[in-house]
């Protein structure tokens, strides 16, 4: 009898392992999976009735992109500054949990002579912002925990949405953003700036042209020792009593590659993911936690026995077409900054770190349109500088040609500005954005899928199909461009609008009136100053509406 009970208990335990509901700490409650021949198969939920995919999604042209920013701590202020230099943009609202941070970003608008933005603050300030009818795009740059709720609110209120990375923290959030984008027919773009770095854009051009032959393997990473930065991350007063800062706290509580997109995004584009190929399976492994655990113990003065994330995480992925991708994450240990970015093809090789280089033999370089200047060229070594420079020039990206110079002036290497300018360009010209909601899901899901793998002895885990059957409809990744005449017309209108806005603001002395409100000594004086500002602001808005 006891033996029978043991057998029953053992069978129950085995069945529990194959339960359709994942229970690991960092997983979303709705994630369903089952075992199949040693692989964890993650289910793909059916597309709700009435929804259609958003591959190649376009929206009506927006002559003037009216944007609101939510989250103005670390990344947000730079985004506000960049948008002040993009023609055809109106910055309508600035929002942060802390009002002073939102108000502090007005300086960028003032410096460029643009109209002051409305300020929103507090834990739920973004909700009122998203309800406004005069906003086209909500740009989300909050802490990770608020990426999803703000984006969800924006999409539910009919706004195009752009979300800093990682844009979704688990599969449940990925699927909800997909469903909202499909339902509302609004763009939901992941703000993966590394796709716009100069080397990555040129390598993408080369991969698309077949310079490397067929790309079979790729590597990417986010390796960045954050010791100098941990103290600058905001501590949410409602859930961070130890003041660890949101990023350290998230790594303590969650396992997996929680920041995969910088390394994964650029190589996924080179591999045409959900544009002729798709990720099918991954296996993840991590080291034990040493540095993060020590940081928390030093910060709190208490033992930390529950630090989830390892110092270094490695994820291996396979695609339907037999390609392999390796992604690494390490923000803990002392080593040089590194995103790897390596492409191994049947006819060539590209690598970005520790220095940018290309390996091609003489015949392949010639076939790629560059004549070698040396006789002993071999793919066993990297191209000499002259040949390398010629190759880079030949495969220069149109995006760099258009935005590269001003991008470098805007800081952070220029890639942030090119990302933002391209997004505005596509919205103004009614084109598909460079990254869609399926990219967002594919690049962000490594956190949960990797955690599921590692929590089950590094088992293989299948990817859900975020396109739900449409990953092979589009053949090859590409950037969209408007016809030259349409592009020129949109650009002329954008520049005219921005100059008109600046002229109206200057004529009304709007910033003098705005500053007078803050300088008022009492309530009566403040009310009087506010009335004068509101009157002038309304006049400026009316003038801007005619531009």
What are these regions (language model features)?
Residues 187-189, 194-307, 457:
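Predominantly a Rossmann-like dinucleotide-binding segment in NAD(P)-dependent oxidoreductases
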Residues 117-136, 140:
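A structured beta-alpha segment of the ubiquitous adenosine-cofactor-binding alpha/beta core
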Residues 16-23:
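C-terminal segment of classical bacterial N-terminal signal peptides
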Residues 315-321, 345:
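Active-site beta-strand termini and strand-to-loop segments that position acidic
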Residues 26-41, 45-47, 55, 77-78, ...:
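C-terminal helical cap and adjacent loop that interface with cofactors, partners, or active-site loops
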Residues 137, 143-144, 148-196, 210:
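Beta-strand-loop-alpha-helix segment that lines the small-molecule cofactor/substrate pocket
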Residues 1-10:
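Bacterial N-terminal signal peptides that target proteins for export
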Residues 27-112:
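N-terminal Rossmann-like dinucleotide-binding module
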């Amino acid at each position: 009898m006891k033996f029978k009970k043991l057998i029953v208990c053992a069978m129950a335990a085995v069945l529990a392992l194959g339960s359709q509901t994942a229970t690991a700490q960092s997983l979303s409650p709705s994630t369903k999976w089952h075992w199949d021949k040693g692989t964890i198969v993650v289910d793909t939920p059916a597309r709700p009735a009435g929804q259609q995919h958003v591959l190649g999604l376009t929206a009506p042209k927006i002559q003037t992109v009216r944007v609101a920013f939510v989250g103005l701590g670390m990344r947000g202020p730079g985004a506000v500054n960049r948008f002040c230099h993009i023609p055809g943009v109106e910055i309508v609202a600035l929002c942060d949990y802390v009002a002073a941070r939102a108000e502090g970003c007005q300086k960028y608008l003032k410096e460029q002579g643009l109209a002051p933005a409305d300020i929103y603050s507090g834990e739920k300030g973004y909700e009122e912002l998203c309800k406004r009818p005069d906003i086209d795009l909500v740009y989300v740059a909050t802490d990770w925990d608020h990426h999803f709720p703000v984006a969800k609110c924006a999409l539910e209120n009919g706004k195009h949405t752009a979300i800093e990375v990682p844009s979704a923290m688990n599969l449940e959030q990925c699927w909800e953003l997909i469903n909202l984008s499909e339902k509302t027919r609004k763009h939901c773009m992941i703000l993966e700036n590394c796709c716009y770095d100069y080397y990555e854009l040129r390598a993408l051009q080369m991969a698309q042209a077949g310079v490397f032959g067929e790309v079979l393997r790729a590597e990417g990473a986010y390796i960045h020792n954050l010791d100098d930065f941990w103290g600058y991350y905001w501590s949410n007063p409602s859930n961070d009593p130890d003041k660890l800062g949101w990023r350290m706290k998230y790594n303590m509580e969650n396992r997996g590659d929680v920041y995969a997109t910088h390394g994964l995004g650029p190589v996924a584009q080179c591999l045409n993911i959900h544009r002729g190929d798709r990720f099918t399976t991954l296996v993840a492994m991590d080291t034990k936690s040493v540095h993060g655990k020590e940081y928390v113990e030093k910060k709190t003065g208490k033992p930390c026995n529950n630090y989830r994330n390892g110092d270094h995480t490695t994820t291996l992925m396979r695609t339907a077409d037999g390609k392999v991708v390796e992604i690494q994450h390490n923000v803990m240990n002392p080593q040089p900054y590194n995103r790897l970015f390596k492409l191994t093809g049947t006819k060539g090789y590209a690598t970005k770190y520790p220095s940018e280089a290309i390996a091609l033999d003489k015949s392949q370089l010639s076939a790629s349109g560059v004549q070698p200047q040396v006789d002993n060229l071999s793919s066993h070594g990297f191209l000499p500088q002259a040949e390398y420079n010629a190759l880079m020039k030949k495969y220069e990206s149109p995006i760099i040609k258009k935005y590269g110079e001003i991008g470098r002036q805007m800081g952070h290497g220029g890639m942030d500005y090119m990302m933002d300018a391209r997004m505005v360009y596509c919205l103004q010209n009614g084109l598909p954005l460079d990254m869609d909601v399926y990219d967002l899901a594919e690049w962000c899901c490594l956190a949960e899928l990797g955690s599921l793998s590692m929590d089950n002895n590094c088992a293989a885990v299948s990817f859900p199909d975020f396109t739900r059957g449409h990953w092979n409809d589009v053949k090859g990744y590409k950037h969209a461009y408007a016809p030259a005449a349409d592009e020129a017309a949109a650009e002329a209108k954008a520049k005219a609008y921005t100059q008109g806005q600046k002229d109206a603001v200057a004529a009304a002395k709007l910033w003098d009136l705005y500053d007078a409100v803050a300088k008022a000594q009492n309530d009566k004086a403040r009310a009087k100053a506010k009335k004068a500002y509101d009157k002038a602001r309304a006049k400026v808005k009316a003038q801007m509406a005619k531009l």
